[in-house]
Structures are given as structure tokens and as C-alpha cells.
């Protein structure tokens, strides 16, 4: 969920006029695709937690939302991410299984995606402004601190 938020803020930053000039024109669609893909993967993994808790209705809602997001991500461009179609197939198979379980056993009403609880976020990185690196020719290289002199 945090990765989705980072890509969303990166996309918002890329749409600013001062940043648009410094970036290749194909970057925003790729970032938009990745944002949708990571959001879809977060929903897929959250659906697995719902499955473990026997919350079939929420599981189905999250899987349907994940399918929508993964499909949108594929349409926008995967940006070099592999196995995206495989994740979409896994999502579709899990959705079929959850629907069968719900139809035969639980008979629960599927909640709307807007009513789903937000997925907890875990910060894993610190965002850097685009212009801090791209706009300053004197800025240290991206990997300069990782390489010993």
C-alpha cells in the first residue's frame, strides 16, 4: 500500500510544469501503470488475509478491485515489470474460488470497494524531490554513496 502511495505522489510531482520539462514524456504513463499495478497487488495480498479470516465477502471485493487495478496497470504499461499477467491470472482464479465458496456456503453480500478498510502502510523508503537530482548538475550521483572510493 505504501508503494502505491509513493508512485501516486511521484506521478503528481511529474505533472508539475517544472518537472515535466526535465522528464521523458513516456515516464508518466509508466509510473501511472506501476501505481495501478502495485495498488492491485496490495489488494490481492490483503484479500489473502481476508481469506485466512474467512471474510469471504471482503475477500471477493478486494479481489475484484485488484483485478480492475491490475488490468488498468497492464493497459497503461507495465514499465518493465514481469509476471504482471500471471498476477492477474492468480487474482482471477482466487476470485472464482471465492465466488464459489460464497455461492455455496456463505451467501454474504459483497461490499463496495469504497467501504473497504484502508490497507495499513509501512514506510520502506524516503521520497526524494525530482528536481533535487535531475535539476542540479552538481548533485552527487545516485550510487555515489554506495561505491567505496
Predicted regions, residues:
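Eukaryotic intrinsically disordered, low-complexity segments enriched for acidic and Ser/Thr/Pro residues
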Residues: 2, 15-149
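Amphipathic alpha-helical interface segments within eukaryotic helical scaffold
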Residues: 1-8
Amino acid at each position: 500500500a505504501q508503494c502505491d502511495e509513493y508512485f501516486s505522489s511521484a506521478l503528481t510531482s511529474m505533472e508539475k510544469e517544472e518537472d515535466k520539462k526535465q522528464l521523458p514524456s513516456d515516464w508518466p504513463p509508466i509510473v501511472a501503470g506501476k501505481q495501478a499495478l502495485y495498488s492491485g497487488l496490495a489488494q490481492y495480498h490483503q484479500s489473502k488475509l481476508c481469506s485466512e479470516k474467512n471474510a469471504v465477502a471482503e475477500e471477493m471485493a478486494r479481489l475484484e478491485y485488484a483485478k480492475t487495478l491490475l488490468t488498468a496497470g497492464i493497459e497503461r504499461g507495465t514499465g518493465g515489470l514481469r509476471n504482471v499477467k500471471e498476477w492477474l491470472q492468480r487474482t482471477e482464479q482466487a476470485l472464482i474460488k471465492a465466488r464459489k465458496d460464497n455461492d455455496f456456503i456463505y451467501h454474504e453480500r459483497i461490499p463496495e470497494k469504497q467501504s473497504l478498510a484502508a490497507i495499513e502502510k509501512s514506510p520502506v523508503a524516503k521520497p526524494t524531490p525530482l528536481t533535487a537530482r535531475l535539476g542540479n548538475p552538481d548533485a552527487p550521483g545516485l550510487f555515489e554513496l554506495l561505491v567505496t572510493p
